[in-house]
Amino acid sequence: MQDAAPRLTFTLRDEERLMMKIGVFVPIGNNGWLISTHAPQYMPTFELNKAIVQKAEHYHFDFALSMIKLRGFGGKTEFWDHNLESFTLMAGLAAVTSRIQIYATAATLTLPPAIVARMAATIDSISGGRFGVNLVTGWQKPEYEQMGIWPGDDYFSRRYDYLTEYVQVLRDLWGSGKSDFKGDFFTMDDCRVSPQPSVPMKVICAGQSDAGMAFSARYADFNFCFGKGVNTPTAFAPTAARMKQAAEQTGRDVGSYVLFMVIADETDDAARAKWEHYKAGADEEALSWLTEQSQKDTRSGTDTNVRQMADPTSAVNINMGTLVGSYASVARMLDEVASVPGAEGVLLTFDDFLSGIENFGERIQPLMQCRAHLPALTQEVA
């Protein structure tokens, strides 16, 4: 593993302490985010995700998000060939939690906006106002071709035009309960949704291209971005700066939430050994599929999420930022993340979710300056 850059010395301001949110990216697909024969092999189930999110809630995580994936990468591990559906999963999780914010992902090519508006209002009712929607345009062509709904490769260059109309319909229906929107992609004729959500519905996105960030700057409450590298916790700073600049153009406050995988153990060496073991078992067949799909979009620029996912540097965990080290080392690196202007939170995955969240809550989070404001844990069993 390449040695990390020298760590920075910094002091968190009070407002930075308060802004650092923590979320869990729940494993809605088999094997989570490690494309390796050496990683834990498991199927996605409601019971597993319930245990994960309830444990996250116990440890004061702020939110839980599930993706949507309609076709996997295959290979020896059948990576992401087995997936639950996001809205129905999160509706179930909303019913068995009480404080944590819940986000489902809408694959917008598969669901009309009026249906998403009504489903979201329903989960708002289930959750008591704790629900929000992550909107994705879709990048993996075979997911949609298999159902006969891929609109053609011109969609790659028009997908944010499509999403702009989509979110305008959502805002109409969540706001007034009625939409007469007329556009190139959607035509509403006295379309109605009632009841409306009990609180303003949060919309989140994960744009890293210029078009994606421009969309988030106009319409999203916050924007996800990839962390970068291994033990380089501030390497994403230029991406956060781009998002901050885009938001300044619209006069809105749209922060960045950064995706990281945590691989922690008692010592740096023990954690590094796990990481090297996972890399040694990389599922090359599944990774080849990912690389092939990343080359299909030739129209969206070089900074798309899928191109980062397929980069060979650390493809075994789709090139999300990776924090490998002792519990103290990971805590220190997460505090460094919090020091980056525009970084309002992190979205975490783990090599082993149940033990990973418990170790995070018991042994990492208490060492983090940017989480020092949290109340004491209750004695209830997580």
Swiss-Prot record:
Induction: Up-regulated by the nitrogen regulatory protein C (NtrC also called GlnG) and repressed by RutR. It is an enzyme of class 1 (oxidoreductase). One of its GO terms (biological process) is nitrogen utilization. One of its GO terms (molecular function) is alkanesulfonate monooxygenase activity. CDD domains: Alkanesulfonate_monoxygenase. Disulfide bonds: none annotated. Its EC number is 1.14.99.46. Keywords: Flavoprotein, FMN, Monooxygenase, NADP, Oxidoreductase. Transmembrane segments: none annotated. FMN binds at I68, K69, N134, E143, R159, Y160, S209. It catalyses: uracil + FMNH2 + NADH + O2 = (Z)-3-ureidoacrylate + FMN + NAD(+) + H2O + H(+); thymine + FMNH2 + NADH + O2 = (Z)-2-methylureidoacrylate + FMN + NAD(+) + H2O + H(+). InterPro entries: Luciferase-like_dom, Luciferase-like_sf, Pyrimidine_monooxygenase_RutA, SsuD_RutA_monooxygenase. Belongs to the NtaA/SnaA/DszA monooxygenase family. RutA subfamily. PANTHER family: ALKANESULFONATE MONOOXYGENASE (PTHR42847), ALKANESULFONATE MONOOXYGENASE-RELATED (PTHR42847:SF4). The FMN-N(5)-oxide reacts spontaneously with NADH to produce FMN. Requires the flavin reductase RutF to regenerate FMN in vivo. This is Pyrimidine monooxygenase RutA. The lineage of its organism: Bacteria, Pseudomonadati, Pseudomonadota, Gammaproteobacteria, Enterobacterales.
